[in-house]
Amino acid sequence: PIWIDDNPNTTVMEIRAKARRLKSRIGNLGLVVVDYLQLMSGRDRAENRQVEISEISRGLKILARELECPVMALSQLSRNLESRSDKRPMLSDLRESGAIEQDADVVMFLYRDEVYDPESSDTGMAEVQIAKHRSGPTDRVRLAFLPHFTKFVDMAKPGSDGPSAQ
C-alpha cells in the first residue's frame, strides 16, 4: 500500500511519529519519500536556513536507521547551474546545504539536455547521474523519456524497434 501525507509544512519529528505509527500498524515500511526537502520545517531557533536544512537532513538520516528502511528526499537545486555551459547538476548544486550531500548514502540527478537546448540531438533522452554512492561506483545511465506518459524507460538495444515500454 501507498500512504501519502501532503502536509506542506511538516517536520522530521512529525514524519517520524507518523511513520512509526504506520510501521506498528502494517509492519516494515518499504520506503519513505520526502518530496521537496526544502519545504520541510526545522526548529524555530536555527541560526539560519542552511543550519535548519542540515538538521532536517541529519534527522532524515537518523529516521532511516531507526525505521530500518530507505528514506528518499527530493531536493531543489540552486540556480548556479544556469550560468554554466554544461547544465548537468553537480553535488555542489544541492540547494541550501552541503549537509544533504554529506548525509546521503546515494545522490542521483536527472538531466535532460532538451530542457536547456530545444534543438538538442538528445531529444527524448534523459540521464540519471549517480553522483554519490557511499558503497558503490558513480556513473551515468541514459534512458528514453516519454513525456506524454512522464515515464523513463530503458534505451532501445541496437536492432530493436524503439524504447522498451515495460
Predicted features and spans:
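C-terminal regions of RecA-like/P-loop NTPase motor modules
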Residues: 3, 9-29, 58-68, 79-166
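Helical hairpin unit composed of two closely spaced alpha helices linked by a short loop
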Residues: 21, 29-74
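Short beta->alpha junction loops/turns
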Residues: 8-9, 49
